[in-house]
Amino acid sequence: MKIIMLGAPGAGKGTQAKMIAEKYGIPHVSTGDIFRANIKNGTELGMEAKKYMDQGQLVPDELTVKILLDRVAQDDCKNGYVLDGFPRTIPQAEVLDKALTELGDAIDFAIDVNVPDENIVKRMSGRRACLSCGATYHVEHIPPKKEGICDKCGQELVLRDDDKPETVLNRLKVYHDQTQPLIDFYTKKNVLKTVDGTKDMKEVFADIVAILG
């Protein structure tokens, strides 16, 4: 079972990907993790990717797909995998699709965790972090005992720049411009399934399990 997770930043797709991986005993393949592992291990592909990253450039799609295919060709992926963080654009999806087709393979499910923008802004701008010990909170869902103060170390909690409403809205714009077209791409391939990501995390997971069987 080969699955791609789609959804806006903050939709909770990473959490769902981990839960799917655990339930079905298949690896959670995150492109960020693969890049870090390849660079850490000094692989040829990793060193090539590092050249781009060190210059602050995006790693070309062909190279990303090469690194990805190298990962999914490993033994632990023979029964499937959950892809998280790739593809993000139509060109990436096309390169991946072509590479999988050449291997006689294909994606079984593309799961879109759908959450309206206003929910995402509320979700992300409610996050608070302790810069001292790394603990994270949410003003609504996981509030600290004392407002604005970390339960663990007593330091002040902050709203990270990444979670500020204007930053979140910018990230959502990029998502809609680049990643939203993937919904149409995978719909045409008859593999797209949409779940309501506004529900409780466990309910969303139950909906995904009902799709995957």
What would you call each of these model-derived segments?
Residues 1-213:
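Glycine-rich phosphate-binding loop of ATP-dependent small-molecule kinases
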